[in-house]
Every structure is written in C-alpha cells, then in structure tokens.
Amino acid sequence: KTTVFNCLTGFYKPTGGTILLRDQHLEGLPGQQIARMGVVRTFQHVRLFREMTVIENLLVAQHQQLKTGLFSGLLKTPSFRRAQSEALDRAATWLERIGLLEHANRQASNLAYGDQRRLEIARCMVTQPEILMLDEPAAGLNPKETKELDELIAELRNHHNTTILLIEHDMKLVMGISDRIYVVNQGTPLANGTPEQIRN
C-alpha cells in the first residue's frame, strides 16, 4: 500500500504502467514537481523538521510555491515581502485550524505525538493540495486523538475541496470517513466499494 503512495509521489518509479493526473504522466517526475501539481503526502512515521519551530515547518513547506527568486529575496522586494506575508498568514490560519497556534514558536520535536501528526497534515495543507495522501495517520494515536483526526479529515474533504487517499488499519475511522474503500492484503486487492458494500 505504501509502495503505491511512493510511486504516486515520485519516491519510486514504477516498473510498468502509467500514472496520470489530469492527463499528465507522473511516473518518473521528481517529487517536488508532483507536489507543485497538488499531490502531497504524510508518512507512516512522522516526518517533521524536528529542530525547527512549529510555524517554521509550515513556512518551509511553502517555499516551493513562492513565486519569488533569489534576487528578490536578497533585495527584499515588495513582491518577496508580499509572498512571505501570505505564507505566514496561511501558516497561522492552519495552525489555528489544528489547534496549535499557541505553540507556533515551540520546537516541533517538543509537541505531543498527536500534535505532531496534526502538524504534518497542516504542513501538507499549506501547499493547497488537490490530493492529500495520509499513510496510517491514526497509528499510535489514543482514542481522543483518533476522533480529532477523524474530524480533521472530514473538514479537509468537505470544506477544502481536497481528495484524501488514506492507508489505515483503524476500520472504525476508515468506515466513518470514506466514500470508497479498497481492501488490499500483501499487495493483493481483496475488495473495493462503498463502506456499506465492504461491510456486507
């Protein structure tokens, strides 16, 4: 399952077949180009810039999208300052949405595990993706954190026009938020359909 995510995001090049997004081939493209096209992901194990602050994690995620170059950055041109201000506003907005605004200047490694998971999702969302891939986001979360994750995923899907691809073993979470489910075991597809079809 994770191998599929790795192929979709450019970490692996598939040995056969094609991957299309809006009729454009993704296979073989570098990950940063795929991310600029609106396809981003989280990982099974939290991947944050642990020594950076919470807000710095969200700012660095937006660098690939800034429309400013080295020259404008060195001279701090009006367009550079505007882009930086917009990135900071977007970061603050997402920190507020995930309940971490008060921890903006805290080192990311000092957050509780559930907060680190939410920060990783916010880091993806500041890039304004069309497709967000979550690789076992509920792993290691307690029931309260899993419920908060469920609510966050529903908000992303319903209010931010983001398609969510989810690899998850928590079947209550999967059944509660999914429109469509694909069941795969050891790389072999077993079933696919709506939650109701899978349940029956």
Task: Please state what every model-predicted region is.
Residues 2-200:
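Glycine-rich phosphate-binding loops of nucleotide-dependent enzymes
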